[in-house]
Curated annotation (Swiss-Prot):
It comes from Linum perenne. CDD domains: PCBER_SDR_a (cd05259). Transmembrane segments: none annotated. Gene3D superfamilies: NAD(P)-binding Rossmann-like Domain, UDP-galactose 4-epimerase, domain 1. The active site is at residue 138. Belongs to the NmrA-type oxidoreductase family. Isoflavone reductase subfamily. The gene is PLR_Lp1. Its EC number is 1.23.1.1, 1.23.1.4. It catalyses: (+)-lariciresinol + NADP(+) = (+)-pinoresinol + NADPH + H(+); (+)-secoisolariciresinol + NADP(+) = (-)-lariciresinol + NADPH + H(+). One of its GO terms (molecular function) is pinoresinol reductase activity. InterPro entries: NAD(P)-bd_dom_sf (IPR036291), NmrA-like (IPR008030), NmrA-type/Isoflavone_red_sf (IPR050608), PCBER-like (IPR045312). This is Bifunctional pinoresinol-lariciresinol reductase. Unlike most other PLRs, this enzyme has an opposite enantiospecificity within the two reaction steps. It comes from the Eukaryota.
Amino acid sequence: MKPCSVLVVGGTGYIGKRIVSASLYLGHDTYVLKRPGTGLDIEKLQLLLSFKKRGAHLVEASFSDHDSLVRAVRLVDVVICTMSGVHFRSHNILLQLKLVEAIKEAGNVKRFIPSEFGMDPARMGQAMEPGRETFDQKMVVRKAIEEANIPHTYISANCFAGYFVGNLSQLGTLTPPSDKVIIYGDGNVKVVYVDEDDVAKYTIKAIEDDRTVNKTVYLRPPENMMSQRELVAVWEKLSGNQLEKIELPPQDFLALMEGTTVAEQAGIGHFYHIFYEGCLTNFEINAENGEEEASRLYPEVEYTRVHDYLKIYL
């Protein structure tokens, strides 16, 4: 892969900072969008300066200043947006429409990677509210990209390990339970777990690959496609601790929404689609439909196995 110039929008965020690091590591000329107010956030500022020390260029631009966005995207071949679309952090998906307009006006961008990195919104048209809002808004952004004829790649990264592996996919915690574990349904629905650093590696691999132009790239590392019960079994073997398993029927799981915040309801809905309906694995990836799978495209990437990821929690 020859080096290219890359602008990361949202480069101080959870996934964005990893994508910046992967871009730098793979030798790309990397630009990071810096918003005017960042100087008042010491953690974000220090992270940006650490990227600068490693060779990244900081580009000041604002979503409220169209011309500044146009100037920023004119500097690069590839734009990657990693703005948050989860309710419990922030919800900025539709801000990307301003970025689409800037890319359209600039006319030089060879690839745009919008902020997706989760479940494929094109397959979530029947998702329940309020979590469906995320998918609907991502489809609005897709429509704008495609109507503007902007070359693009959609990344469907499935379940981030930090949120779904270390906690054995339990709600309300990020670390493994010590005595009992809630099993969703029978716990045998297949799920896909991906280390966030691997999400970044696969994303950067895709940006100059002609095979991924105007396609959806699914991240399905084969050894990380497993059921929740299989995930629990891996942890039990590593820790030597057998957990009490409590099966939660679908109707009881959905009842957890009652009395919760909108953000919590969205999260519960997403869990339901993943662990009860199997939305991540209940379809075949079909190249004829504009779909590719990352581990097949890039077998050289040594992705982190669930077994190895869990070792940090021992």
